[in-house]
């Protein structure tokens, strides 16, 4: 009797030792990745005198948020026009691709962080509305000779109305929100949409509130990317999905050279001609080059707690869509 008990105890101790070693290895890998990410971001992890990048400049951390705010305050009224001019309209296809990968179902709640002028939220509401209409058409086709029970159920569902999808646009910049609200009014979007002034690093929402979280062309402007990712994880419901559309590292060397030439020589000029603001668009170009590449950003998302993290390169890696789930 003693021998089996002794064998059982030894096995438990052995398993516990292996688990401890596994945790220590994971922790070591995490710290190594964090050190690499910190170095890439260009600021110290010490608590005093921390600095970060603002484009190619090195600035104190507390100054970056203010500088970024002023950039978007300056470009807000011409932001959408400049997006079309800079990308030759391709940004619309990138955003449509984000929605198709996301494939949101009717009735879900979206947090569109750094949502600015509402592009992603408008697409989300239109997509879920179209999805609901398609589901209704398929349902009607499958009921060519409905029973009285089906007819009664149809009347009940009509009274209840379609499931209401909701999008919350959260942006730290009030000028961007003002432009977005005007766009929504002009487009006749009156339901399912709300606007909140808030910081991606300290979201003004309770835990487990949203089914989906998107941030499009915004996370590279955040001072502490890890903190923004942790906030995304916090406000998502279990099973919720994180999606980020952001400029990334071009994978083709020839395209990379052409892209660099276009970015640095043409985009600031367009900014001056269209928006009367060279410096803001010079910063935007530089901020793209300072953002982590696809693999490093994927690791950052995993470190925030997300699972099944993957990314999709678009237009040769000029932009990438990262996706992850909160389990």
Swiss-Prot record:
TM region(s), chain numbering: none
Keyword vocabulary terms for this entry: Membrane, Methyltransferase, Mitochondrion, Mitochondrion inner membrane, S-adenosyl-L-methionine, Transferase, Transit peptide, Ubiquinone biosynthesis
Source superkingdom: Eukaryota
Class of the enzyme per the UniProt entry, highest EC level: transferase
GO biological process: methylation; ubiquinone biosynthetic process
Membrane topology designation: Peripheral membrane protein
Protein family (similarity comment): Belongs to the class I-like SAM-binding methyltransferase superfamily. MenG/UbiE family.
NCBIfam families: MenG_MenH_UbiE
Protein name: 2-methoxy-6-polyprenyl-1,4-benzoquinol methylase, mitochondrial
UniProt organism field: Danio rerio
Gene that encodes the chain: coq5
């Amino acid at each position: 009797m003693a021998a089996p008990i002794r064998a059982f105890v030894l096995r438990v101790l052995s398993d516990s030792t292996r688990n401890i070693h596994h945790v220590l290895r994971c922790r070591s890998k995490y710290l190594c990745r964090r050190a690499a990410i910190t170095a890439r971001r260009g600021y110290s992890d010490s608590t005093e005198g921390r600095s970060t990048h603002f484009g190619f400049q090195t600035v104190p951390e507390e100054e970056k948020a203010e500088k970024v705010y002023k950039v978007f305050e300056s470009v807000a009224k011409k932001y959408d026009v400049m997006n079309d001019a800079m990308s030759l309209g391709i940004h619309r296809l990138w955003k449509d691709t984000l929605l198709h990968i996301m494939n949101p179902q009717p009735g879900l709640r979206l947090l569109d962080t750094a949502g600015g002028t509402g592009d992603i939220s408008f697409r989300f509401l239109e997509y879920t509305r179209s999805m609901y209409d398609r589901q209704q058409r398929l349902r009607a086709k499958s009921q060519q000779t409905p029973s009285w029970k089906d007819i009664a159920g149809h009347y009940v569902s009509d009274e209840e109305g379609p499931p209401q999808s909701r999008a919350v646009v959260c942006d730290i910049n009030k000028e961007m929100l003002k432009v977005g609200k005007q766009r929504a009014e002009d487009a006749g979007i009156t339901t399912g949409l709300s606007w909140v002034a808030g910081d991606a690093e300290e979201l003004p929402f309770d835990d487990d509130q949203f089914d989906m979280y998107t941030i499009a062309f915004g996370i590279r402007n955040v001072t502490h990317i890890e903190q923004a990712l942790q906030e995304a994880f916090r406000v998502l419901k279990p099973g919720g999905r994180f999606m980020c559309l952001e400029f990334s590292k071009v994978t083709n060397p020839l395209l990379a050279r052409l892209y660099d030439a276009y970015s640095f020589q043409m985009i600031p000029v367009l900014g001056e001609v269209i928006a009367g603001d060279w410096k803001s668009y010079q910063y935007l170009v530089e901020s793209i080059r300072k953002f982590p590449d696809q693999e490093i950003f994927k690791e950052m998302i995993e470190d925030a707690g997300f699972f099944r993290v993957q990314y999709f390169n678009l237009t040769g890696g000029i932009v990438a869509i990262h996706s992850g789930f909160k389990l």
